[in-house]
Curated annotation (Swiss-Prot):
This is Exonuclease V, mitochondrial. It comes from Debaryomyces hansenii (strain ATCC 36239 / CBS 767 / BCRC 21394 / JCM 1990 / NBRC 0083 / IGC 2968). It is an enzyme of class 3 (hydrolase). The keyword Iron-sulfur applies. Binds 1 [4Fe-4S] cluster.
Length: 630
């Protein structure tokens, strides 16, 4: 029984297939779609008329979409739709036809229909299969490279709802290759055991508080105790998104840039910037940034590789030797651990950086993975790779204060967190603080002690804020609420017994930390330290860029490197074009190399490879009605 309204779908399918006088019964998977083909006395009959086909479709909730998928795309080549398109591509095309109200026989438009009011960026931020782009409107660096394959394809992808790409085997191999390179430079510290054990202690503490509440009789006492329990739970293992971002900034900015300055290289470093579509420029000074924040678009990226070196003598490591000779480390009583005071380190290293700033430079490299020792053939792809690393250089320079001072990096990091709906002053959970301490104790233990004691860390904006907010009223950041007395000994004992790295917490979890802190650990602290480390790199900024091509099937070896010089004017020109595209002030530019159309999900309806197709002269109403059924 065809439900009311389904006739519309059938009529739509009928019109869509009207260009096919007849087609073979073998082209339809009758079992899959529950199609009951007419009986015919001629057992050899393989053709059925369109009317016959449409009469016998028995719609059920389970097969409606599948039938539409099979019919909605023109089978111009005579091939089965299931052989030509994957499910994702069918959905992508179906969504686009619906959005653009495309009728049978019409090709996709070359510009946005007038009834769609959203710009490409607004649509990307409103209708996106990756909901994180809806909750946190932003672009990646690669999204600015709209021309790298076909701008029209990017345009269609956006208005089809930006379907998430299914990870291919090649993509997986590329991810594994990047991780392998990362681990060659940065040790992976296992914190699973400490998180698990901390969770167990936290749950014991919470259960104890709950049992205490059950012993109370006075309603006011119960209400007060429940409020205390809520705060305790949040303190011990709450603030999950803030804690996650703290880990990202600690591991992918602070730790990485500290490693760069001390050892000459770092991998996988987070960068971001803010693009003004109106001016078509990335904001690079604090005044403009604070004045126009609401009009700026967040653009994020990850630098694959940073190398700090002497371009005239790549064997020269004298700066790093001087750093090791002049920087003071503190050792534990049994010399198992060494710690550095970041505040003092930044002071001590300043004259060394000034001495070597004319000699040493930072080169920025992006790593591309291939399945064979061959570069991409398309010039647009090679050019996009170059521009991608130029964007990284541009954003790294802005965060380092290339055009302003240290404050701009700090404010941009805070704004980044706020745009992700994070509270930069919400205390990081005790659980995360302990895991971060294990993974990064060399560079943050002394900072933990400073915060606990209410001391300045040497960054004026952060210190001034902390003085005004906490030192007169205090904070509720208290490690003793989970680790005190015998709990501490038991906690450390369990960690020692299970820790795979042989890590000794006994000399780290001292009374200097296990107390009520005067200044809590927050994202604001991590933004402050991140901006200081970015600023440390400012004197070494250079025009040296490169792209490395690695073969993932030959032990990830680098088989070719392209070297470039940073060109700010080129970036400005490309950014202007990208801004006009995303802001909707110009239509997309079609591809000229038609061989690319062979790899496009929209080629069957696109007028560029099919100039004989009708360009939509008007947009019918069928598409909008189809939304109710597909």
């Amino acid at each position: 029984m065809i439900r009311p309204g389904k006739v519309l779908v059938l009529n739509f399918l009928k019109r869509s297939l009207s260009n096919l006088a007849t087609f073979k019964g073998s082209e339809i998977n009758t079992k899959k779609y529950d199609l009951k083909l007419p009986n015919n006395s001629d057992s050899n009959k393989q053709y059925f008329t369109l009317d016959e086909k449409l009469k016998v479709i028995q719609y059920t909730d389970a097969n409606e979409e599948s039938i539409i998928d099979e019919f909605i795309l023109p089978l111009s080549s005579g091939a089965k739709a299931s052989d030509t398109y994957q499910k994702t591509n069918l959905s992508k095309m179906r969504n686009l036809l619906t959005t653009f109200h495309i009728d049978e026989g019409e090709s996709l438009p070359l510009s946005k229909p007038g009834y769609i009011k959203e710009t490409p960026f607004e649509y990307h931020s409103k209708y996106n299969s990756d909901t994180s782009y809806v909750s946190i409107p932003r672009l990646s660096v690669t999204k600015l490279l709209t021309f790298q394959w076909c701008e029209l394809r990017e345009f269609y992808t956006i208005f089809s709802g930006s379907p998430v790409k299914k990870e291919t085997k090649e993509m997986k191999l590329g991810t594994e290759a990047h991780l392998k390179l990362e681990l060659e430079t940065h040790n992976l510290i296992d914190v699973e055991d400490i998180e698990r054990i901390t969770d167990e202690f936290v749950e014991k503490k919470i259960d104890s508080s709950k049992r205490h509440i059950n012993t109370l009789a006075d309603p006011d006492d119960i209400l007060l105790a429940k409020d205390d329990l809520s705060k305790l739970t949040e303190l011990l293992h709450g603030a999950i998104p803030e804690s996650s971002m703290a880990n990202e900034w600690m591991s992918k900015i602070i730790s990485r840039l500290f490693t760069l300055i001390n050892t000459s290289e770092a991998r996988e470093v987070l960068v971001h910037g803010y693009l003004d579509f109106q001016t078509s420029h990335f904001t690079s000074n604090l005044h403009d940034f604070q004045l126009n924040q609401s009009n700026l678009v967040l653009v994020s990226g990850v630098v694959d590789y940073l190398k700090l070196f002497n371009p005239h003598d790549k064997t020269d490591y004298s700066m790093f030797e001087d750093i090791q000779d002049h920087v003071e480390f503190t050792y534990s009583s049994q010399r198992k651990h060494q710690w550095i005071d970041l505040s003092q380190f930044l002071k001590d290293i300043d004259p060394i950086i000034k001495e070597y700033s004319d000699t040493y430079k930072i080169a920025i490299t992006d790593v591309k993975t291939r399945s064979w020792n061959k570069l991409p053939q398309q010039e647009s792809v090679l050019q996009a790779a170059k521009l991608q690393v130029e964007y990284y250089r541009n954003m790294f320079g802005i965060l380092a204060g290339e055009f302003d001072d240290i404050e701009i990096g700090y404010e941009m990091l805070l704004e980044n967190a706020k745009r992700r709906n994070l509270d930069v002053d919400k205390p990081i959970s005790i659980k995360s603080a302990l895991a971060l301490l294990k993974a990064n104790h060399t560079i943050i233990l002394k900072d933990y002690v400073k915060l606990a004691n209410g001391e300045a860390i040497g960054f004026e904006s952060f210190d001034r804020f902390s003085q005004e907010r906490y030192l007169n009223q205090g904070s509720e950041y208290d490690f003793t609420k989970v680790l005190e007395g015998t709990n501490r000994e038991d906690y450390i004992s369990q960690i020692k017994a299970s820790d795979k790295d042989g890590f000794d917490f006994d000399e780290i979890l001292t009374s200097d930390i296990l107390k009520a802190w005067k200044i809590p650990l927050t994202l604001r602290y991590f933004a402050a330290r991140s901006s200081q480390l970015f600023h440390l790199c400012k004197p070494f900024l250079s025009d040296s860029l490169s792209i490395e091509y690695h073969n993932v099937k030959k032990n990830d070896q680098c088989f070719h490197t392209n070297y470039y010089n940073y060109n700010a004017n080129e970036i400005d020109e490309v950014t202007a074009k990208a801004s006009a595209f995303w802001n909707g002030t110009r239509p997309p530019i079609p591809v000229q190399d038609l061989s690319k159309c062979n790899y496009c999900d929209f080629s069957s309806r696109c007028v560029i490879p099919n100039p004989h197709k009708n360009v939509p002269g008007s947009y019918g109403s069928v598409g909008s009605k189809m939304k109710h059924f597909i």
